[in-house]
Amino acid sequence: MTIVELFDEKPINNIVGILAFNPDKVIYVGGYTRKHFESKKLPILKKYLDRKGYSALDIEYVQVRRDSFKDIMEKFENIYSSDSGCVFHVEVTGGEDLILIGLGALSQRRPDIELYQISSKLRTIRSFSLSADDGRKLDIECRNTVEENLLLHGASIISANGDETFPGGYRFDADFVHDINVMWDICGRGSKNMVSPSAPNSWNKVTIMLASLNAEDPDRENQNLLCIDAQRFKEEYMTSINGTLFYDYICYFIRCDLLDCRIESEHVYINFKNDQVRMCLTKAGLILELKTYLICKKLMDSRDGDCLTSVTIDWDGDENLASTIKYLYNLDDPDSTIDTTNEIDILATCGLIPYFISCKNGKFTSEELYKLYLVGEQFGKGYCQKIIVTTDLNHALGDAKNVILQRAVDIGIQIIEDVHKKTDDEIADELKKVMELPKIKTCV
């Protein structure tokens, strides 16, 4: 089978026909020069297709003049004639206006041409032609993993799921999931296990204090054991402005088996349960990120999707295929290239739709909105969903809350508020709603 794809600025539009119909050959039609296509677009496309198992696919590119309807028609006629004997399939989701008009004119002349279009949510593919009375819906599903979506957009994953800190990444065994739920409950309800509007803020204060202690001796032999001078611990932590708060939380952490604290005459010893718990108790926003990830991953798994957390993205990929210019740290060292990177709290895909989720357990500014918007549009052009999951916005943002919320809405970012007051099912329902997830298919 030969298919024709109208080459588009949105990379997802360029691979729908390939994923749907598994052709032997694809012909891209577009306004880019052949040189630009082969040097800038094709390497990224081939790397993606190789990963998807299409390394043997025959790829051809036909350049048309964007301003010449005659040239467009001639090129389409040539493609049709040269592939006579083959079914002529054209995927029309992408493409420029005049090229689409040309294709319409060709379809009028050649009513046997089958056209395909995927819906705006990338879930439904319909086939139609002038020789048929009506179009038909095809039972075809296309999917990308998180990594495949980034490859398609010229990027790569530097690290994910905590593998920059832990060999093999986070260990989401039953014990760690239990600890996440315990810590999340403390973050949302406070050390007294009671609902409090300022509980997330209290959590942030205590974890920042623990982070300060954790950073004092980074080369210590036992990373989970902190040794602090007793007098200094008393003056700086126990009798400081947040001393009572810190003491209450440490006592509660002990009761929940998250850490142990031993006070001696000369030193105070804080021993974390394990390295993953230590990370959660010394990085203020991590517990919200991991809790949201577990809920989101469950939603994705039930829909054959993909979900990663703590994803660091290299914008132009391992081989710099997406770069146009590379600047150097050291002008005398050609290998000292500068890579643009971003970390996204949670990246997910369902079908072909990518989701970019940022988790905020405290104060943030409109700059964070623009960062999320930029990264989402860069690696999900036209189709990405951008979401911010938050705890106590009233306390964190104060009078600026509605200004930031309005700005988020204006640039297409969904915000889920006050998740610390909600059950897992309520959070999942809100995620399903803003992500516009399809219903789970059930076997009859």
What is the predicted role of each segment?
Residues 1-87, 101-341, 353, 370, ...:
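Long, low-complexity, Lys/Arg-enriched
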Residues 7-12, 95-97, 363-364:
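Short beta->alpha connector loops
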Residues 87-93:
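Short glycine-rich phosphate-binding loop at a beta-alpha junction
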Residues 92, 98-101:
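C-terminal structured interaction module
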Residues 361-369:
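Intrinsically disordered, low-complexity segments enriched in Gly and acidic/Ser/Thr residues
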